[in-house]
């Protein structure tokens, strides 16, 4: 990837987002976590739970290989803040953002810039049980800086997550469905009718190491042919929870192979991630 001034600006902006979220989190919770209030395995379990009570700021970098007719390289930096709120003694609200910064090869318009932003809000009962679920709306904001890395559409729909914690294992499914409902002038391509399916299973160890197998499958229901409809990667990652001064964080590395993708889609990818984590205020 060619590191441009825009790339450095995006990285600085991402760092600012992380610092603001960390600074706004309760200092007492941070002290308790660093002092052992939650051990590494418990933090690892919460990181594997998409709707846990952690304020987290993942910086996820993906290298997608085999993109376009020339089998080029696409890089995607996803910033994915997760902020939970307790709205009543029995209910939590968890807000999740996905803010991508994309660099595409020349065969796909050689575009680099901010992609569409996705916001999800889950309402989850605070039952204290091993079966956890949450449901709510998901919205895509057409904030892309280049038409080639965005849909040009406002989209919305439902989202759902269901998971089970069984000892050291966590397994479940995150799902959403998006339909476009408004168009950005002169930038729209086609209407959005897209499903997202993320089944996952994670094995957490007392050391804070987590082994995860998951998929982030996308179904383009408007695709003209079956071969263009599905994008199905199988991803395997290893992550480790540790501390940086008073703050716990996680590092992750992994790879994925695409068992199905459109003709212009990738063949395989590499992933690294760094996640700042902080327990939310009780």
Q: What is each PLM-predicted segment?
A:
Residues 29-282:
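Transmembrane beta-barrel domains of Gram-negative outer membranes and organellar outer membranes
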Residues 1-39, 281-282:
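Cleavable N-terminal export/targeting peptides
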């Amino acid at each position: 990837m060619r590191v441009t001034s825009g790339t450095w600006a995006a990285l600085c902006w991402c760092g600012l987002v992380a610092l603001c979220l960390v600074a706004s989190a309760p200092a007492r919770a941070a002290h308790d976590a660093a002092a052992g209030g939650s051990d590494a395995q418990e933090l690892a379990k919460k990181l594997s739970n998409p709707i846990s009570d952690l304020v987290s700021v993942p910086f996820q970098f993906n290298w997608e290989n085999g993109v376009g007719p020339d089998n080029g390289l696409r890089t995607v930096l996803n910033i994915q803040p997760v902020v939970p709120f307790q709205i009543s003694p029995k209910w939590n609200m968890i807000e999740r953002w996905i803010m991508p910064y994309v660099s595409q090869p020349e065969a796909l318009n050689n575009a680099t810039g901010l992609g569409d932003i996705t916001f999800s809000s889950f309402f989850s009962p605070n039952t204290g049980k091993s079966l956890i679920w949450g449901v709510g709306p998901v919205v895509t904001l057409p904030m892309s800086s280049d038409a080639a890395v965005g849909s040009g559409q406002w989209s919305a729909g439902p989202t759902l997550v269901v998971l089970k914690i069984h000892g050291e294992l966590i397994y479940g499914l995150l799902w959403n469905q998006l339909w476009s409902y408004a168009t950005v002038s002169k930038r729209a391509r086609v209407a959005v009718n897209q499903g997202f399916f993320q089944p996952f299973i994670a094995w957490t160890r007392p050391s804070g190491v987590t082994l995860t197998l998951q998929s982030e499958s996308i179904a383009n229901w408007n695709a003209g042919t079956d071969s263009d409809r599905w994008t199905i990667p199988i991803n395997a990652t290893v992550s480790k929870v540790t501390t940086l001064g008073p703050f716990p964080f996680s590092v992750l590395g992994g790879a994925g192979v695409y068992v199905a993708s459109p003709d212009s889609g990738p063949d395989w990818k590499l992933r690294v991630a760094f996640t700042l984590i902080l327990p939310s205020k009780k």
